[in-house]
Amino acid sequence: MQNMVILGATGSIGASTLNVVACNPEQYKVFALVANTNVAKMLEICIAHQPKIAHMVDAKAAQALKQQLPSHLKIEVTTGEDELLSLVSCSEVDTVMAAIVGAAGLPSTLAAVNAGKRVLLANKESLVMSGQLFIEAMQNSGAQVLPVDSEHNAIFQCLSERSQLEIGRCDLTGAGVSHILLTGSGGPFLTSDLSSLVNMTPDQACKHPNWSMGRKISVDSATMMNKGLEYIEARWLFNASSDQLKVVIHPQSVIHSMVQYRDGSVLAQLGNPDMRTPIAHCMSFPQRISSGVEPLDFFKVGQLSFLEPDFNRFPCLALAIEACKQGQEATTVLNAANEISVQAFLDGKIRFTDIAKINEQSLMNTATHPLNCIDDILALDFQSRQYTLNAITKLN
């Protein structure tokens, strides 16, 4: 029986994880659930899964949850940053699902890694921001990090066993890998007229053709910044050079990514677009468990098509690839800027096409400094956010 902590329990990845747990109750126990402010959802899942601990990042939300939880459940409600870091490091915890969206997820994810836990990594921003520090922490602690993002999970499954055991320090060339092919659907605006993008609304941007996701990641998919962040994540997870990474647009989201080998072989992982599949794979690796997902029906799939990315349509993707080449400081700045600009778009403060423009401004103009520890990373993250907020104010 594995004791699990689910960070971001009230989000879409949290919900999918709890669904997989419910399919396999004899193997997994929810030890703790962690959320930010969503008391109603947390109350619902606490009653359903009865964790030992429910942690709310927001203190007022924690108090509200404590008042509403039935007393007979005997669930301890906690709050506070130190309490969260202690929770993921607790000796009773085996596995941590790291699914807090954005930079907010970095401290708790890194704490779980430093504690040597089995970390199911759905928070791509942790690697985008901390990169080498994250990999070094993983190697020093002996933590097992397994990629939950469908693309990185697909790549992981297509690699050799030796490479799977060397996450963060893979020798792709030695393993015969020529290229990692990172697939992406192109989002809801793949075929829209370029001139129409300026008027796209948040609701339109959040209508992904294949996946059901939260609003921030849905906008990132529409700009393809999500693929750019995944490009950076793949660079660190698989120790890949920019020459070894390629982005391929695959509108059907059936092939989740591919690995091309020196001998001409291409291995691909296919499946229905449902996050329960990679979650179940990570939870049970190297075994396999039920995910609750319907098997892929090849007779209904139809045509599979592939396109080269158009950087005029997706300037955020180009920015992310360039930032990856520049290094850790640039990717930290870009990630922070993007979180602010996407939220501004969702709040109706800027236009869809302003996201890339503001991100580029921040990347070009935020002063950087060496990143030697997590405090350095968070300081640069804050600096980039402040610059971006000012840029948005000037725009309006």
Swiss-Prot record:
GO terms for biological process: isopentenyl diphosphate biosynthetic process, methylerythritol 4-phosphate pathway involved in terpenoid biosynthetic process. GO terms for molecular function: 1-deoxy-D-xylulose-5-phosphate reductoisomerase activity; manganese ion binding; NADPH binding. It catalyses: 2-C-methyl-D-erythritol 4-phosphate + NADP(+) = 1-deoxy-D-xylulose 5-phosphate + NADPH + H(+). It comes from the Bacteria. Its EC number is 1.1.1.267. Its cofactor is Mg(2+); Mn(2+). Pathway: Isoprenoid biosynthesis; isopentenyl diphosphate biosynthesis via DXP pathway; isopentenyl diphosphate from 1-deoxy-D-xylulose 5-phosphate: step 1/6. It comes from Shewanella pealeana (strain ATCC 700345 / ANG-SQ1). 1-deoxy-D-xylulose 5-phosphate binds at residues 124, 150-151, 185, 208, 221, 226-227, 230. PANTHER family: 1-DEOXY-D-XYLULOSE 5-PHOSPHATE REDUCTOISOMERASE, 1-DEOXY-D-XYLULOSE 5-PHOSPHATE REDUCTOISOMERASE, CHLOROPLASTIC. Mn(2+) binds at residues 149, 151, 230. This is 1-deoxy-D-xylulose 5-phosphate reductoisomerase. Catalyzes the NADPH-dependent rearrangement and reduction of 1-deoxy-D-xylulose-5-phosphate (DXP) to 2-C-methyl-D-erythritol 4-phosphate (MEP). The gene is dxr. NADPH binds at residues 10-13, 38, 123, 125, 214. Keywords: Isoprene biosynthesis, Manganese, Metal-binding, NADP, Oxidoreductase. InterPro entries: DXP_reductoisomerase (IPR003821), DXP_reductoisomerase_C (IPR013644), DXP_reductoisomerase_N (IPR013512), DXPR_C (IPR026877), DXPR_C_sf (IPR036169), NAD(P)-bd_dom_sf (IPR036291). Belongs to the DXR family.
